[in-house]
């Protein structure tokens, strides 16, 4: 019985130490979450403003050339059907906004983590992507993968998938300069025709307890809202000309969208890590509580046995 009590005490001490570690990790993840969540919210506001400005700038030029109520403009039916070459001379950068006539290859920029202990964060990304790749294979589509995060990169390579680029080691609070190589490579491969469209696949942070897997079309840029019903209260002074401005703004806009996805995914990763460590700490407390109950019962049984033996010995002496 004494050996059993000793084993229980060792188990309790071991699990308590594990619980202390997971609680410390929960607190660290919470601090990281607060930082990236604030940055993510601020960057979303910035990105929305950039999108609105680019959309308004391009709309105003198209409206100016066609006239707000012309038949040609009304027949566009949205930005996807517009031939931008009729309005802008963007050269090779035209493909940033103009869908290619034939899609020969599709690129997927997949964002995962570099480590475990983040709950189902990585497994959900991989599960959803394998479903997408399975559908693409069934349709004989050529797929090229850009993997951000060692977990996804290693898994996809083991599955013999076409990983054309991989990057690991994104910091807990990523900056644009840090991930510049990822962003520039993604855009460069698209402009060079390695793939004809690019989707960014990542986990969107909703709140601490909720996240959602997203597949967003990044290239060609589809978030430009060309709408002839928009009011045009802003007057732009464009120097030197609209084409030069767009040649600078459009690449920056496309890169900012990719960075926004990376920042959002990192926020979701911290939230998942914090939730997982919180759950682990609670489980440790529950196990310790159960073991302490078991220990107390074992002590009571030992004391009862000792008392019985003492009484039995006393009776034998009478």
Swiss-Prot record:
GO molecular function term, any single one: proton-transporting ATP synthase activity, rotational mechanism
Signal peptide stretch: none
Pfam families given in the database record: ATP-synt
Species lineage: Bacteria, Bacillati, Bacillota, Bacilli, Lactobacillales
Localization per record: Cell membrane
Family as reported in the entry's similarity comment: Belongs to the ATPase gamma chain family.
Protein name, entry field: ATP synthase gamma chain
Family matches, as Gene3D superfamilies: 3.40.1380.10, ATP synthase, gamma subunit, helix hairpin domain
Gene assigned in the entry: atpG
PANTHER family: ATP SYNTHASE GAMMA CHAIN, ATP SYNTHASE SUBUNIT GAMMA, MITOCHONDRIAL
Key words, A-Z: ATP synthesis, Cell membrane, CF(1), Hydrogen ion transport, Ion transport, Membrane, Transport
Assembly and interaction partners: F-type ATPases have 2 components, CF(1) - the catalytic core - and CF(0) - the membrane proton channel. CF(1) has five subunits: alpha(3), beta(3), gamma(1), delta(1), epsilon(1). CF(0) has three main subunits: a, b and c.
